[in-house]
Amino acid sequence: MIIKNARVFTEDGSFMQGDVVVKDGRFDSVLERTADTDAANDSAQQEIIDASGLIMIPGLVDIHFHGCKGADMCDGTAEALDVITAYEASVGVTSVCPATMTIQRDELLSVMKNAGDYNYHGGAHLVGINMEGPFISPSKKGAQAAENIMRCDYDYFCELQDAAHGLIKLVDIAPEEPGAIDFIDSVRGSVVVSIAHTAADYDTAVEAIEHGASHATHLYNAMPPLHHRNPGVIGAVRDSEKCHAELICDGVHIHPSVIRATFAMFGAERMILISDSMRATGLEDGEYTLGGQAVTVRGPLATLHDGTIAGSATNLMDCMRFTVRKAGIPLEEAIMCATANPAKEIGIYDEAGSISAGKRADFVLLNDDLDIVSVYIDGKEISC
C-alpha cells in the first residue's frame, strides 16, 4: 500500500510532502514527493491511497487515561478492554497505556492480571499500564479513594507486575511519604517512577528525582502550586532536564495561558499530552463512576459530588486539538507531545510514535481542520 501526496509528519518533527509505503503492516519507506518517486510508485502495482490535501500523523499514544465509552480499566474484564481499545482507535489513539485507580488491594491485583492476560482483538494496541495509586498522599488524593491509599510496598508492586506480565510501565508515588525514596531505589531502571498526588516541597521532589523519578503526573493537578518562594514539585521537575511532565489540555484542568507558559518553561520535548479520560468519554452527560466513586459529567467537566475534578471526559485527539486551537501551541509540537514523547517515555518508540521505516503502520489522516478522515492500525483501515 502507498499513501501518496500526503503532508507527512516526519520523525524530525516537521512536515514533508511525500509518499509512504506500507508493507506487511509496517512502514517500509517514507519518500519525499518527486517525479522519480511518482514513477516508481506507479509501477509498483500496489493499493494507492490518495492523501492529497491531507495531513498524515502517527497514531496518538495515550499513557494516562482511565476509560471511555462506558468502560474503565478498573472494571477488570476483557470486555472493558475491548471497548476501550476500540473507542480509542476510532479517535486516532492507536497505542494505549491505561491507568488504574487507588482501589482495594486484591481488586488491583485482579485488574493487573486481566490486562496482562488480555488477547488483542484489534483496535488500539495495549502497550502498558500506568499504576496511578495507591502509593500517594492522602492530602492530595484528588478523586482517588482515601481508604485504599497505602505506603510504597516493593513486594506488593512486584506481585502486581508479575500479575501484569511486566506490563506496568509507570508507577506513581508521593515522594514525601515514608518509604518512598527507598521504593524508588528498588524499582529504578525497571519502571518509570512518576511524582504524583503529592504535597512534596521542592527539596523532597529534587531528592526523588536524584534517586530516579523522571516523570510528573498531570502537572499542576493534585500537587502544590508553583510559588515564587516555594517552587515545589513543579519547580523541581522544571529544573531537571531528564524529567518529563504530563499535561491535561482539555480546557478544564489547565488554563490556555498556563499551557503556553509551561511549553515555554519546559520546552516541547519534555511535555506529554494526556487525556486522563474516564468512562463517560464518548457518551452523554450524566452520572458515572471512577474508582468506585460517583462522578457527575457535564460537558468536558467531570466532578465528584464535592466538586473535586475527577479525570476528564475528553479524548487525547481533542486534547491535542485544544492545545493547538485554544492554547496556540504549534501543530508540530502538539503532535510530538501526543506521539513521540509518550512513546519514548514508556519505551515503545521502536514500535510506535513516529512514521518511520520498520515501525507499526499506525497512522491517522486528518484534514486541515484536524478532523479525522481515516485511521489505520497495522496498515489496515479501521472503522471510525
Regions found by a protein language model. Give the residues of each.
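Active-site gating loops and adjacent loop-to-helix segments of metal-dependent hydrolytic enzymes
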Residues: 86-97, 137-165, 207-219, 230-244, ...
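Active-site core of metal-dependent hydrolases
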Residues: 162-283
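His/Asp/Glu-enriched, well-ordered alpha-helical/loop segment
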Residues: 236-245, 251, 263-275, 280-366
